[in-house]
C-alpha cells in the first residue's frame, strides 16, 4: 500500500461539494476541482513514479471530517477512479448533502467502503454539525440502498463514546486499512 497525504490549501473550500454559508462561515464548493485534480494529475504522476495498478479497484481515497466528505462525494462523481473509500467522520451534516445522496443513481460497480462515526460527534454543538450522527444514519441507509453490486463491501463502524477528534480518526483509519487492504 502506498499512502499519499495531501495537505489542502483550504479545507472549507477544497473539500466541500458546493458553495454554502453556515452562520458566518463560507464554504467554497471546490470539491469537483479537487477530485478532478487528484484523478487527472496526482494519480497519473504517482503511476509514473511508482509501479501502481492501472485498475481502479486498487486505488482508494480517504479522509476525515471534510476529507471524509470529499471522499464520499468522489464515490458519486468519480466512481470510475476509485475502488476503495475510507470515510472517517465524514461531514454529512453539510447543507443538502443527504438530499444530494438521495438524488444519486444506483451504484452498479464494485466498491469497498469503510465508514466510521462516533456517537457523541456534534452532541455539544449549536452548529449544523450537531446533526452529524442522525445525518450519518440517514446517509448510511441511503448508501446501503445505492450499492447494488453483490461484490461491493460496506463496513460501518461506530463508538458510543467517540468524538470528532484526531484520536478517533487515527484509531479508525487503522481499522479501515486493515479491513479494506
Residue ranges of predicted features:
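Non-catalytic cap/lid and distal C-terminal segments of serine-dependent acyl enzymes
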Residues: 1-181
Amino acid at each position: 500500500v502506498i499512502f499519499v497525504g495531501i495537505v489542502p490549501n483550504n479545507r472549507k473550500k477544497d473539500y466541500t461539494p458546493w458553495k454554502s454559508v453556515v452562520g458566518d462561515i463560507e464554504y467554497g464548493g471546490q470539491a469537483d476541482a479537487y477530485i478532478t485534480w487528484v484523478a487527472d494529475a496526482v494519480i497519473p504522476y504517482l503511476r509514473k513514479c511508482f509501479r501502481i495498478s492501472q485498475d481502479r479497484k486498487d486505488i482508494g481515497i480517504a479522509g476525515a471530517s471534510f476529507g471524509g466528505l470529499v471522499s464520499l462525494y468522489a464515490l458519486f462523481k468519480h466512481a470510475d477512479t476509485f475502488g476503495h473509500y475510507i470515510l472517517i467522520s465524514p461531514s454529512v451534516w453539510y447543507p443538502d448533502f443527504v438530499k444530494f445522496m438521495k438524488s444519486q443513481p444506483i451504484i452498479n460497480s464494485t466498491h469497498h467502503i469503510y465508514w466510521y462515526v462516533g456517537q457523541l460527534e456534534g452532541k455539544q454543538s449549536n452548529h449544523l454539525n450537531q446533526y452529524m450522527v442522525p445525518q450519518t444514519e440517514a446517509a448510511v441507509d441511503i448508501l446501503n440502498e445505492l450499492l447494488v453490486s453483490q461484490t461491493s463491501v460496506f463496513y460501518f463502524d461506530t463508538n458510543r463514546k467517540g468524538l470528532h477528534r484526531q484520536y478517533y480518526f487515527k484509531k479508525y483509519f487503522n481499522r479501515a486499512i486493515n479491513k479494506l487492504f
